[in-house]
C-alpha cells in the first residue's frame, strides 16, 4: 500500500491522506479521482491559475518524467504546492497528459 499525502489547497478540499493500492506512481491521480470525483479537474484548474503541484516520491522530488518509471511500489507520495519557477517539470507536466 502507498501512503499519499496532499498538501495546500488540495488537502483542504479533498482531505490530506489516502492509502492506495498502486504499483505505478503514474496511477496516483486517477486512483484519487476515483475516490474523490473532480480531483483531476481541480488539479488542472489550479495549474492553469498558476498554482502547480510538485510530486515527491519516497522523499525525492521528481524533476524529470523518466524518474517515475524506475519507482515501482512507492511507500509514500506527496503532492505539494510548487514554488513558481522551481524547475523544469511540475506534477501537471508529468501527469496531466497521461490517459
Language-model features: locations:
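A broadly conserved detector of short glycine/acidic/proline-rich loop/turn motifs that flank catalytic sites
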Residues: 8-10, 24, 83
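Generic detection of short hydrophobic beta-strand segments and adjacent strand-loop junctions
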Residues: 18-20
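Short loop-to-beta-strand transition segments
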Residues: 34-58
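Short amphipathic, charge-patterned alpha-helical segments
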Residues: 23-39
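Alpha-helix initiation/capping motif
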Residues: 7, 36, 62-64
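Eukaryote-biased recognition of intrinsically disordered, low-complexity regulatory segments
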Residues: 1-16
